[in-house]
Curated annotation (Swiss-Prot):
Transmembrane segments: none annotated. One of its GO terms (molecular function) is tRNA pseudouridine(55) synthase activity. One of its GO terms (biological process) is tRNA pseudouridine synthesis. HAMAP family: TruB_bact. This is tRNA pseudouridine synthase B. The gene is truB. Its EC number is 5.4.99.25. Belongs to the pseudouridine synthase TruB family. Type 1 subfamily. Signal peptide: none annotated. It catalyses: uridine(55) in tRNA = pseudouridine(55) in tRNA. It comes from Ruegeria sp. (strain TM1040). Responsible for synthesis of pseudouridine from uracil-55 in the psi GC loop of transfer RNAs. The keyword Isomerase applies. The active site is at 47 (nucleophile). InterPro entries: PsdUridine_synth_cat_dom_sf (IPR020103), PsdUridine_synth_N (IPR002501), tRNA_psdUridine_synth_TruB (IPR014780), TruB_C (IPR032819).
Amino acid sequence: MGRKRKGRDISGWLVVDKPAGLTSTAVVNKVRWAFDAKKAGHAGTLDPEATGVLAVALGEATKTVPFITDAMKAYTFTVTLGAATNTDDAEGEVIATSAERPTDDDIKEALLGFIGEIQQVPPKFSAVKIDGQRAYKLARDGEEVELSARPLWVEELVMLDRPDADHVVLEMTCGKGGYVRSIARDLGEKLGCLGHVRELRRIWSGPFDAEDGVTLEQIDALAKSPEIDQFLRPLEEGLADLPELKCTPQGATRLRNGNPGMVIASDVEYGEEAWASLEGKAVAVGTFKAGELHPSRVFNQD
């Protein structure tokens, strides 16, 4: 019999404004400790030196993590022009330099080529797996890392500022699996001047905004106290991109037991993914078919 997990059965989302210098895992561990939560996870890794939205799910909200991971995200970032690094950010070693510097118009024109569906090769220092091993571990060991290009949807990529000839500030809105470091690297190569990320901030992720985020100082100040629960947001916010269907108490009972349950639907199409609620609380996520929701995930909420 497995060991019983210690902690509170607490569920919800905590939007953390992650500071630079911490891994995403370290932030999740701190949140789990501060809330004395049995279960916690995050919806999308941020590099250690990156800041901004890190959405942490507690308890039953962890079942909604895939919907935030798949959601659109936005970043602001500064690209240093004239140098490439082995990590594609400022933490790595400079491996090549260039004296070329593009004009503002050159940059704006080049950015157009990164909008829409693009093919992107992840950085060699990334968590992508190659034959079961993380790429960054192979790269650290000095092994040659070859990563395949993968599709990425870029909704928007614009220049916000050009503080000097060596730097450009950009904002990007993109879908799942985007590497900002790869954008900086590929933009530098396209402009003929090389480039890498100097600073990176995730300003929103799905329904969660950095400006609404909680700092680690706020978490530390209220850790292990009842007052810390004020920062939690309902797990239902993790389902913001799915249509909501109302269900009856009888339908909710069936859904909680893993069976199809009757729901009230108007604008949902047959076969569409949706979630069912009873008195505002999520009961299940599933597929809508002929007046019923066929559950794929069930929430255990009081």
